[in-house]
Amino acid sequence: MLESFSDLSALGGVTFERDPYADFHALQAESYCGTLISDTNGGGTINAERSFLTGFAYPHSRYRRDTWSYVRYFAAQGYSTQGGHPGYEWFYDRRSVNENLGFSRYDFMENHYEALPVGGSDYHGRPDDAAFFADRRADYLARDPSQSYFSFSVTYQGHSPYSDTALEGGVYCAHDGLSDGAYCMINNYLSSVADTGRQLRAYVDSFREDEAPVVLVFFGDHKPTLGTGNCYYAELGVNVNENSDEGCRNLYSVPYLIWANDAARRVLGDRFTGQGETISPGFLMAELFDRCGWDGPAWMQLQRDTRRRIPVIHRQELFVVDGKWESELQPDARPLYDELRIAEYYVREKLQRREQGSS
């Protein structure tokens, strides 16, 4: 999962002097890719993170006890389960929650990344994407090759704040039509995005010739906040008014892509290319399983049934149904949503209740 990664070129009217998305778009051209509608803007990273790992919709529980997740599902299929995030384990209570979601090992600043050399640049004391992706590659190479490998990691580069008083990287948007603050902040954000794209491409390249089948999933957690009240989006000519369909899509849309090396394409019988649906983060794991040709657990079957009609379930009970934003579901769609939430409660509580009963 890529911190604050979004494709501003997908928003109508935004033009660049240099393309900050050249490497990312090259990856999209050889991947299965689509759009997520995130629950948040500029923060709340764990909403997308935990939705992907569980399939659960907003609002989330606090995960204070062992809870069912796709991490546990992979572990039950014989996978090792690990990951990393160059942030502190106490933030969002990630250490405890990740243990409760079933990760056997997770690297944080305290137990791993504080000792990692970061080379020429860092981000608030954290490793940059070059160091982070190299570390995740090293973790993969150190795996037990006799065991299948599931790794979920979260980047830090791209995290706000972005300076609005000085340029800290390259120039991608011209100054014409932008205030000084917008010019600096937007270009600083795009400089980070461009570097993330370069690091993604290098990371993907490192798996191309791997004899083991490898499938990689990348997605943004949310769009960045650009200026007070997102005022700098307006200077770009982008509508982010939440009272309109266009504004909601612009404000909450982030990209996802699913890439597979040749070995995985042969084994799974899929090219892993083409255009995917616009969905909520909670449906992304099901999208991955569909590409892999895997059935998944019963919970995922219900997710698929719901996704066909309601592909986006947004916080505060906003939905996308038949391509349109709705604040109130139609009578024929409401039972699908209600059934999903009831099943979600059961799936979430089942493991906790089982453990309570055995104690």
Which functions belong to the PLM regions below?
Residues 1-359:
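Solvent-exposed soluble domains appended to multi-pass membrane proteins
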